[in-house]
Amino acid sequence: MQFSEELLTLKDQVRFDKSFKVGKYDKIVIAGMGGSGIAGRIFSEIYDEKPVFLVDDYDIPSFVDDKTEFIAISYSGNTEETISASEEAAKKHANVHAITSGGSLSKMGFDTIIIPSGLQPRSSIGYLLMPLVNTFIKPKIGDVDEAYRLLSETDKDNEEEKSIASEIYNGEHIPVIYGSRPFRAIAYRWKTQFNENAKVLAYSNYFSELNHNDTMPLKDTYRKDEFYFLVFRSDDSRFSKRITVTEKITGNSFRMVDVRGSSLLAKLFYLIHFGDYLTYHLAELRGVDPQDVSLIEKLKKEIA
Amino acid sequence: MQFSEELLTLKDQVRFDKSFKVGKYDKIVIAGMGGSGIAGRIFSEIYDEKPVFLVDDYDIPSFVDDKTEFIAISYSGNTEETISASEEAAKKHANVHAITSGGSLSKMGFDTIIIPSGLQPRSSIGYLLMPLVNTFIKPKIGDVDEAYRLLSETDKDNEEEKSIASEIYNGEHIPVIYGSRPFRAIAYRWKTQFNENAKVLAYSNYFSELNHNDTMPLKDTYRKDEFYFLVFRSDDSRFSKRITVTEKITGNSFRMVDVRGSSLLAKLFYLIHFGDYLTYHLAELRGVDPQDVSLIEKLKKEIA
C-alpha cells in the first residue's frame, strides 16, 4: 500500500469500535513507544477521571499493582521496551491489556485487541487510540461521524497542507509546532511525522509553558529566520491571548492552524490528519519516501 | 547579585533541609511553570513509590481529591497558572503545600516552605527541589555532601563547559540535548537554560523514545550541520548501546557529557550545574545578559 493510500484509511479507523472490559482500578498505565506511544499521549490529555501514567521506557514505576489497568500498545507487537514493560506489569499483577497487530505481544496471554496489519504504525493512530477512547470515554456516535466527515474532506482537499509544505521546503525551514491543551500531544505527533515522513528535524512545545522559556530566544536567537512556527489556534481565551502577545513582543509572525470541528474527537483527528498531509507533501517535495524508516529498523537489529 | 554569583549559591542550596509533613495519600500532584516547574519534573523521574502527576497549566485534573498531596511551586509566588491550579486543588480538599519565596502564594494559607528571595527562579533549583526530596526520598547525608563537593569543584573549574560554549557560539549552532532516564528532565532543564540564559532556541529529547522519531532525520535532514548534539553518557547498557548505534548509523558525532558522581543526587546536581555554566558562558560569548528575562515579564504584564 502506498503511503497516500494508508492516509485514506484513517477515516474508517475512527469507527473501530473495540474496547476492553475493565474491573476496579485506581490508575491507568499506558506503555508504548514512538508512533504507538502517541495514542497514550493523546488519551492522557483528554481523560482525567483517574491518573494516567505513560511509560516510554523498558521499566515500569514501582506503584504499578493489582489496582492498575495496564495497556501495552505496540503496532508491530515486537517493540522491546513495551514487551519488557508488559512483562514487569504482569509480574506485579496489574490487569494487562494489549493493542497490537500481532508479533510477540499478541502471544503473551494478555487481554488483547488485534488491529489490522499492513500499515505503518503512525498511520494506524485511529486503531491504536479508539480502543482507549471506547473503553474509558465512550464517544457519542455523532462525534465519530463528525470525525469521519472531516477526515474525508481532508482526504479530498489538502491544499492548505500542501501550501505550508511548500513554504517549509522552499526555505529549508526547521518546523516548530506549538500546541496548547488539549492538543499538546498532537503538536508532538506533528513533530514525529516531520521526522519519520519528511526526514527533517522538528520540535514541539506548548503554551503556556513555552512562555517561561522559548519566549526569550524567540526575539533574539541567531538563525531565527530558519525556523517555521506552526501554532494551533485555541478557543481558550487564556491561550489565545498568550499566542497573540507572544507574537507581538517577540516580533514573530506565526503560521496559525485553524482547528476545525465541534466535538473534541473530531478536532483531534482533524488536526492529526492535517499534520499527516502536511508532512506527506513535504516528503514528496524533498523526494524522500515517507514510508521509509529503514534506519529505525536497522537500529533495532543492531541493538538486538 | 550577578548571575555568576547566583550560580555559586547552588552548592549551599542542596543542604536546604526543610520538608513537609504529609499524611495518608495515594498520589502526588506538583504544579509549577518554567524554572519552578523543573523541580517537579526532576522529582517525578526519581520517585515512583506513588504516582506523581505534573501540572503546568491553569487547571488540575478531575482525579485530585482528599488523598492527594498537592505541591504548588512558584519562586515568585505570583505565577498565574500555579495560583489558579492551587485554588482549584484547595476546593477539592487536596492537602495543599507550597514552596515559594513570597508573593500571593505565600498568603493563601497553605502549608508553606519559604525559600530565600533575590535569585532568578532558575538559579534556585536546589531550594525548589530539596523539599520534595527531603519529604519523599530522605537523602543520605553522604549524598548531600557529595553533591556539595561536586558543585564546588564545578564552580572552580568549568573549562569544559566554556569550551563547549565556544564551539556552539562559533558555529551559531542550535543545541539539542539528548538525555535518558533518570536524566530526561535535566536535558529539558538545559534546553530552558539555553533559552533563558543564552537566548538561543534549543531542544531536548531522550533515549530510547528518540530512536522512534529523531533517528530518521538525524541522517538526512537539511541543515544537519547547524545542530549541536549534546548527549549525556549513560551507565545503563541498554541506553549506552543505543547511543553508540545511533551515532554510527546516522553518521553523527555526538558531544558526549560525562555524568560525574556516585550517588543519584550528586549526579543530578552535577549535570544541572554543568548546564548552568555552559549556558552562562554562551551568554557571555553572545554578549547577552543571562539574568535578563524582561520579555517574559513584559508578557506577564500584557496578559494580566
Curated annotation (Swiss-Prot), chains A, B:
Keywords: Carbohydrate metabolism, Isomerase
Domain spans labelled SIS: 16-147
Binding site residues for D-fructose 6-phosphate: 35-36, 74, 76, 79, 122, 212, 300
Annotated catalytic residues: 196 (proton acceptor), 212 (proton donor), 300 (proton acceptor)
Signal peptide location: none
EC number: 5.3.1.8, 5.3.1.9
Substrates-to-products reaction catalysed: alpha-D-glucose 6-phosphate = beta-D-fructose 6-phosphate; D-mannose 6-phosphate = D-fructose 6-phosphate
Top-rank EC class of the record's enzyme: isomerase
Keyword Isomerase part of the UniProt annotation: yes
SUPFAM superfamilies for the chain: SIS domain
Oligomeric and partner information: Homodimer.
Family stated for the protein in its record: Belongs to the PGI/PMI family.
NCBIfam families with a match to the protein in the record: G6PI_arch, PRK08674.1-2
Protein's name in the database: Bifunctional phosphoglucose/phosphomannose isomerase
Species assigned in the record: Thermoplasma volcanium (strain ATCC 51530 / DSM 4299 / JCM 9571 / NBRC 15438 / GSS1)
